[in-house]
Amino acid sequence: MRSAMNPKDTLFSAPIDKIGDFTFDERVAEVFPDMIQRSVPGYSNIISAIGMLAERFVKPHSKIYDLGCSLGAATLSMRRHIKQEGCQIIAVDNSAAMVERCKLHLNAYRSDTPVQVIEADIRDIAIENASVVVLNFTLQFLAPDDRYALLEKIYAGLRPGGILILSEKFVFSDQEAHELLIDLHHDFKRANGYSELEISQKRSAIENVMRPDSIQTHKQRFATLGFSSFEVWFQCFNFGSMFAIK
């Protein structure tokens, strides 16, 4: 049963005359937990595993960054798993609506690991003394020309042995496979109660602001930057998550 705390996403359920670009505004922030669960295959698994990966890679007296934190799901997962002393999580999002709700979510749970929630462009954040950096479905919303520079800054700010966790929607060079995975994703959304109108209108709204890369493109960037190990650790249809270890 859906609670009042997690209202149903009906943002695209009625016909919209002029569909504008998708933005992470108050309307989206309000329904985001329902939207993300019903739209992103494997989202709960990714969030849970981010906590487990953080537990394995976090170092005492280091910083953990959640860049594009939205409502703080990855931050909460990591905070539950961190046992090391002197750590701090820095959660960043450029949406004021997301940041305010993120603070409320985090304040509902007690933890020994402090979290600083910052409203800012992740490209403007200094990365330093980091043992874990998370980009959970965030990089795909940056301008393509800005992606390498951000990853370069993350690499420079990671401690040796530190990990970058990158979750993204993927595109595929094999057109038949690419179209099949898109169709399966739409089947997933239909199975979760989205109508054809909702799927079509959401796709129109988001196609100009979310520009996914291929797995090969991500791996080429990691190799160029100098990461010692990188791989896809989770994939469901055209969504997945990768790690890159410095």
From Swiss-Prot:
Molecular function terms from GO: carboxyl- or carbamoyltransferase activity; S-adenosyl-L-methionine binding
Pfam families recorded: Methyltransf_25
EC number(s) recorded for this UniProt protein: 2.1.3.-
InterPro entries, sorted: CmoA, Methyltransf_25, SAM-dependent_MTases_sf
Binding residue positions for S-adenosyl-L-methionine: Y43, G68, C69, S70, D93, N94, D121, I122, N136, R203
Superkingdom field: Bacteria
Catalytic reaction(s) noted: prephenate + S-adenosyl-L-methionine = carboxy-S-adenosyl-L-methionine + 3-phenylpyruvate + H2O
Keywords, alphabetical: S-adenosyl-L-methionine, Transferase
GO biological process terms held by the UniProt record: tRNA wobble uridine modification
Family: Belongs to the class I-like SAM-binding methyltransferase superfamily. Cx-SAM synthase family.
Cited HAMAP family: Cx_SAM_synthase
Cited function: Catalyzes the conversion of S-adenosyl-L-methionine (SAM) to carboxy-S-adenosyl-L-methionine (Cx-SAM).
Quaternary structure annotation from Swiss-Prot or TrEMBL: Homodimer.
Protein name, per record: Carboxy-S-adenosyl-L-methionine synthase
Species in which this protein is naturally found: Vibrio cholerae serotype O1 (strain ATCC 39315 / El Tor Inaba N16961)
UniProt gene name: cmoA
